[in-house]
């Protein structure tokens, strides 16, 4: 007899890939057989102890997990309120959380007999992580990257090339992440037989949002255990930056059924009223993009608007569908931080903790800096420090008027 499904937020999506009214699979007819094949392969892999053992092996011995939980003592004193802990996923191999998902997906590609890897990238971190695992398993790799992002992320472009990947600049649209994803989907339609598309965020058609979340959920599982060891209890607040939303859902998933306040921080760019931001939950409305229904930045005619953020990893005009669902039911609070606030937080982290964060988690830190002073000293904030800032030093220098 089947056990009843517990009343849990962690059981979604449903069998159609839906999180409430969000998610699903809106893809070209030529892709549907492949999507169904991918779903079947993933469901089988998830239930295969050998696959999960192999995944854990690479996370431990190649990625370097578990990543540490760090009490940011000097930052805590400077802010003068709640204790601030960092989940330090920037210490992973390749410098961000992206590698967790790439390991899982390339093991699935290998299991399915696929011989060619494609990916999209914005900041370049997912591109680097995909090129890394493709090199590890000896598979050819093509990374689609908006021409605008190629210009502002030169170090990561060179890293991808060193790792043997071909980087294809995309010049359509605003030449950023949305456009790179469009090109990758076109490639996949044209090469369905031998190609595996490693999507970097918790978006795209089902099963990608659930699959990426599951591979990233190691972040929250580890952080939960580490928090219990360090403090004997769960945090009061867990905070993460939101672009497509994979690092955030990876952290949040372990806490969805707990009394932990969850906060996602979108990129407010030059301000929510400026029209130059990437805050699709704050300023968007539901629509369909890249195979799923979710909140999107769009005009009155339903045309997708260009997103802006100082952080190349956050300037996506949509959000993973699970975040849209969690927003609508009120389980997660979604706020935003501007370019200037993220820059200030970036510098604060460097100065107080000796850690150069990526501009993506600097948005989360900007919100930590807002709320921590108003909380008592026994309160605990857990923040996902999901990437290191080496890739961003040229951008930061330019904004600070420095020449490198």
UniProtKB/Swiss-Prot annotation:
Its EC number is 4.2.1.20. Gene3D superfamilies: 3.40.50.1100. The keyword Transferase does not apply. It is an enzyme of class 4 (lyase). The keyword Lyase applies. Keywords: Amino-acid biosynthesis, Aromatic amino acid biosynthesis, Lyase, Pyridoxal phosphate, Tryptophan biosynthesis. The modification N6-(pyridoxal phosphate)lysine is found at residue 98. InterPro entries: Trp_synth_b_CS, Trp_synth_beta, Trp_synth_beta/beta-like, TrpB-like_PALP, TrpB-like_PALP_sf. Its cofactor is pyridoxal 5'-phosphate. Tetramer of two alpha and two beta chains. Belongs to the TrpB family. The beta subunit is responsible for the synthesis of L-tryptophan from indole and L-serine. This is Tryptophan synthase beta chain. It comes from Acidiphilium cryptum (strain JF-5). The lineage of its organism: Bacteria, Pseudomonadati, Pseudomonadota, Alphaproteobacteria, Acetobacterales. The gene is trpB.
């Amino acid at each position: 007899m089947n056990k009843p499904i517990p009343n849990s937020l962690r059981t979604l999506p449903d069998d159609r890939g839906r999180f409430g009214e969000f998610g699903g699979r809106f893809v070209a007819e030529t892709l549907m057989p492949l999507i169904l094949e991918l779903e079947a392969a993933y469901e089988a892999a998830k239930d295969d102890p050998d696959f999960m053992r192999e995944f854990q092996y690479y996370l431990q011995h190649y990625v370097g997990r578990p990543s540490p939980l760090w009490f940011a003592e000097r930052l805590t004193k400077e802010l003068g309120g709640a204790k601030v802990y960092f989940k330090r996923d920037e210490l992973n191999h390749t410098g961000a959380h992206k590698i967790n998902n790439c390991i899982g997906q390339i093991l699935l590609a290998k299991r399915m007999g696929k011989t060619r890897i494609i990916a999209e990238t914005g900041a370049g971190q997912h591109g680097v992580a995909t090129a890394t695992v493709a090199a590890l398993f000896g598979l050819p790799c093509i990374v689609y990257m908006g021409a605008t992002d190629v210009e502002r992320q030169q170090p990561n472009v060179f890293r991808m090339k060193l790792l043997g990947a071909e980087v294809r600049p995309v010049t359509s649209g605003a030449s950023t992440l949305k456009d790179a994803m469009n090109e990758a989907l076109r490639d996949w339609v044209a090469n369905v037989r031998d190609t595996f598309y490693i999507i970097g965020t918790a978006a795209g058609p089902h099963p990608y949002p659930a699959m990426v979340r599951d591979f990233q959920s190691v972040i929250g599982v580890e952080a939960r255990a580490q928090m219990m060891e360090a403090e004997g209890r769960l945090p009061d607040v867990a905070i993460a930056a939101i672009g497509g939303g994979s690092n955030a859902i990876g952290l949040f998933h372990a806490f969805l059924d707990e009394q932990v306040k969850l906060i996602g921080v979108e990129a407010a760019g030059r301000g929510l009223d400026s029209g130059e931001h990437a805050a699709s939950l704050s300023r968007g409305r539901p629509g369909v993009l890249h195979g799923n229904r979710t909140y999107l930045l769009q005009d009155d005619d339903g045309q997708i608007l260009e997103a802006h953020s100082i952080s190349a990893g956050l300037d996506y005009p949509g959000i993973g569908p699970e975040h849209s669902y969690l927003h609508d039911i009120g389980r997660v609070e979604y706020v935003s931080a501007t370019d200037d606030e993220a820059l200030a937080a970036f510098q604060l982290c460097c100065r107080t903790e000796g850690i150069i964060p990526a501009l993506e988690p600097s948005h989360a830190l900007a919100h930590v800096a807002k709320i921590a002073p108003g909380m008592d000293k026994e309160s605990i904030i857990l923040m996902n420090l999901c990437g290191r800032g080496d890739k961003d030093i040229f951008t930061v220098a330019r904004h600070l008027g420095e020449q490198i």
